[in-house]
Regions:
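C-terminal membrane-cytosol helix-exit motif in multi-pass small-molecule transporters
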Residues: 172-190, 208-218, 235-249, 486-493
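Central cavity-lining transmembrane alpha-helices of secondary-active solute carriers
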Residues: 52-66, 116-120, 306-318
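Flexible interhelical linker loops that connect adjacent transmembrane helices
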Residues: 2-4, 177-206, 248-266, 324, ...
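12-transmembrane solute porter fold
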Residues: 8-24, 29-31, 41-44, 200, ...
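Helix-loop-helix hairpins in multi-pass membrane proteins, especially solute transporters
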Residues: 67-200, 352
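Hydrophobic transmembrane architecture of multi-pass small-molecule transporters
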Residues: 177, 378-379, 395, 399-494, ...
């Protein structure tokens, strides 16, 4: 497929705008949560579903929707998904009950699962020149990173003047713009030999991913003592094992499991998982640091994190020329090494640290993240024929969703466990209050407010200091993981060419011998 240059760059703009909308929406709910709870009064289980159902639907359907896009057309799927996303955003904004809100958020997740793989696979199909493709994927990665940083800022700004639903209603005009312009500008592309969509694989992939993500999120929130965590984890792992075995037998699988035997593909996936694993856990810790330790407002804390998004955007934009100069393995290793260095800098943060130091640490870590994601995403896409770009995009994004959930579960547990175990309270604190104080820093500040003034001041100061100490331990754990991954990535990606040539299918629909995907 030959696409005129203006339409190529128009496609990139629309894909980036769609991804920007999704990235903002992934983080904006946390800003709206306090007002939402105050006005709607959901029960505790309802609130957890309001927060989590979007991610469950999104993660569970990415693989399926990536394959659907390869079959019916990526443009068609994107326009359908964006229309549904706009409608679901309006339903979410005006939800009258918690049950309505949960259903609307689930629909948002389904729509998001159609959009995410469509954006990246369209870029893969219109940018057939390998060097321009690397540049385009770098721009897409930059915009995605910027969107995650903008979410808290946009949410905080809207909530200062409007009701909680405004953070979702703002999606509607952007979705309309994408649908109207995209219907004219976007070229259509699909796999000319898609084969039959295996209807057994679809539920296996959905159950496997959703159950594992549910188990990880539940473990992060409630610990691993409950039977529900283990039942969900077992169900998810069994489903994923059955899914993987079935893919190996199918002529037209949802996921070509042979790709994981290719070092470039599996190495890039692994780098993505561990990088997002560490970054999301650090983001969670520092959101609490800004708001609960320093006492900043949600808007101020969102603005404080903006340099990180800008750094990641800059890293993504610079990745393509760096690949030309250094090669893929070295750029990924450099990115992971910079992220590790940034985490070491994070590990020195205490209650007296100035914001300027925080900005420096954020920029170092986030530029490294930008390098890593831009190169690994391009490597993943380049490892498969463009006819299967939707499936490859879905694999990458599913791995990131699971890596993020795993990071919050594991490093979040390190943070919470260190806080609980190291907190030393004055003897005069009542036992029931002590239990609430040990539960979380937020609970500590709320409980301390009801204690006598002098005792409240002591408890508040102690809880904040213990949290900061625990945060230091958590980010240093992340630094070690990133440093180890930098060494592993250098080995795994060694020999991957700077410019990965186009992968074509033979007459039977398999990657031609000698291509990257066939190795």
């Amino acid at each position: 497929m030959t696409v005129p240059s203006p339409r190529k760059w128009g496609t990139l703009v629309i894909a980036c705008l769609a991804m920007l909308l999704l990235a903002i929406d992934l983080t904006v709910l946390h800003q709206a949560a306090p007002k939402l709870v105050e006005e709607m009064r959901p029960s505790a289980p309802q609130f957890l579903w309001i927060v989590d159902v979007y991610g469950f639907a999104l993660a569970g359907l990415l693989v399926t929707m990536g394959n659907v896009g390869d079959r019916i057309g990526r443009k068609r799927l994107l326009l359908i998904g964006m229309t549904a996303f706009g409608a679901a955003s309006a339903l979410t904004a005006y939800a009258p009950t918690p049950e309505w809100l949960i259903a609307a958020r689930a629909l948002l997740g389904v729509a998001g699962a159609t959009i995410m793989p469509s954006t990246l696979s369209m870029i893969r199909n219109v940018f057939t020149d390998p060097r321009k493709r690397t540049t385009a994927v770098g721009v897409w990665s930059s915009v995605s990173a910027l969107g995650f940083a903008l979410g808290p800022v946009v949410g905080g700004a809207l909530l200062n003047s409007f009701w909680w639903g405004s953070v979702f209603l703002v999606n509607v005009p952007v979705a309309v713009l994408i649908v109207v312009v995209g219907s004219v500008v976007l070229p259509e592309s699909r796999n000319p030999r898609p084969g039959r969509l295996d209807l057994v694989s679809v539920p296996l992939s959905v159950v496997g991913v959703v159950a594992v993500v549910y188990a990880l999120k539940t473990a992060a929130h409630d610990g691993v003592a409950g039977a529900g965590v283990w039942v969900a984890a077992a169900a998810g792992l069994v489903s994923l094992v059955l899914f993987t075995r079935r893919q190996a037998r199918l002529a037209e699988p949802l996921i070509d499991v042979r790709l994981f035997g290719h070092r470039a593909f599996s190495g890039a996936i692994g780098a993505n998982v561990v990088c997002i694993f560490s970054m999301l856990a650090a983001s969670l810790a520092f959101a609490q640091y800004f708001q609960l330790v320093l006492g900043w407002s949600p808007l101020m804390s969102g603005l404080a994190g903006l340099p990180g998004g800008l750094g990641a955007a800059a890293g993504g934009a610079l990745a393509a020329p760096l690949v030309t100069a250094l090669g893929r393995a070295r750029v990924v290793a450099l990115g992971l090494g910079l992220s590790a260095a940034g985490f070491v800098m994070y590990g020195q943060v205490d209650m007296a640290t100035g914001y300027g130091y925080m900005v420096a640490a954020m920029i170092v870590a986030s530029i490294g993240t930008g390098f890593t994601f831009a190169v690994t995403n391009d490597t993943i896409l380049a490892s498969v024929p463009r006819e299967r770009a939707g499936a490859a995009s879905a694999i990458a994004e599913t791995a990131q969703e699971m890596g993020g959930a795993l990071g919050i579960a594991v490093l979040g547990s390190v943070l919470n466990g260190a806080y609980r175990n190291n907190l030393r309270l004055p003897a005069e604190v009542p036992a029931d209050a002590a239990d609430q104080i040990r539960e979380s820093l937020g609970g500590a500040l709320e409980t301390a407010a009801a204690l006598p003034a002098r005792l409240a001041e002591t408890v508040t100061e102690t809880a904040r200091q213990t949290f900061v100490d625990s945060m230091q331990m958590t980010v240093m754990t992340g630094a070690v993981l990133l440093a180890l991954l930098a060494v592993a990535a250098l080995a795994a990606l060694r020999g991957v060419p700077k410019v990965i040539a186009e992968v074509d299918l033979d007459d039977e629909g398999s990657p031609q011998k000698g291509s990257v995907a066939a190795r």
